[in-house]
């Protein structure tokens, strides 16, 4: 598109660093626009979350540039329409999970968002059993479970190549999962797991 999107968050190995939630875009005329920030006052899980932080990636809907998704390193995925926050996908209202033993809403780690040609949104849900999830345009969530990367904590970057394959980069070794690159060839059929081919190189 004709926008440059940025986020100002990070997933720190020891939770030693965090940044206020910030997601913005730069248009062709050089103007910056900030997306609405989630607040307690706005009703976004105010009973559970203390401070919203760490926006990590922005995904523009390929069919509607006013429709965006923002992943965050602490609070799941946020959905926007016309710059306004309309939804949050997190522990309890979606398949995305918290990585903490107490299932705290402050540890719902998501990153590496991307959308395929059919409008299906892929995100990494780090440090849990099923790390890669797909949200179809109809709102149904589909798991992409691969045992060798289960509980990987640092899937932060992703691309889709010319053959429609997903390439996720795990930045560093974390527990039993090495840093490396995961390729998912799902045959561009998110509902059919029988043709999925996973390759993890580290």
What are these regions (language model features)?
Residues 1-202:
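Carboxylate-rich, polar loop motifs that coordinate divalent cations or form catalytic acidic clusters
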């Amino acid at each position: 598109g004709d926008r440059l999107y940025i986020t100002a968050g990070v997933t720190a190995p020891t939770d030693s660093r965090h940044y206020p939630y910030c997601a913005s875009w730069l248009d062709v005329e050089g103007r910056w626009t900030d997306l609405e920030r989630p607040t307690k006052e706005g009703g976004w899980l105010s009973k559970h979350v203390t401070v919203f932080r760490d926006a990590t990636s922005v995904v523009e809907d390929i069919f509607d540039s006013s429709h965006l998704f923002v992943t965050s390193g602490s609070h799941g995925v946020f959905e926007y329409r016309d710059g306004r926050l309309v939804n949050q996908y997190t522990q309890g209202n979606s398949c995305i999970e918290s990585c903490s033993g107490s299932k705290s809403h402050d540890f719902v780690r998501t990153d590496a968002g991307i959308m395929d040609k059919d409008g299906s949104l892929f995100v990494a849900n780090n440090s849990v059993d099923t790390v890669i999830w797909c949200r179809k345009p109809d709102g149904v969530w589909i798991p992409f479970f691969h045992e060798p990367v289960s509980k990987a904590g640092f899937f932060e970057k992703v691309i889709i190549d010319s053959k429609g394959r997903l390439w996720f980069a795990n930045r560093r070794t974390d527990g039993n999962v090495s840093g490396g690159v995961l390729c998912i060839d799902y045959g561009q059929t998110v509902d059919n797991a029988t043709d999925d081919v996973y390759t993890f190189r580290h």
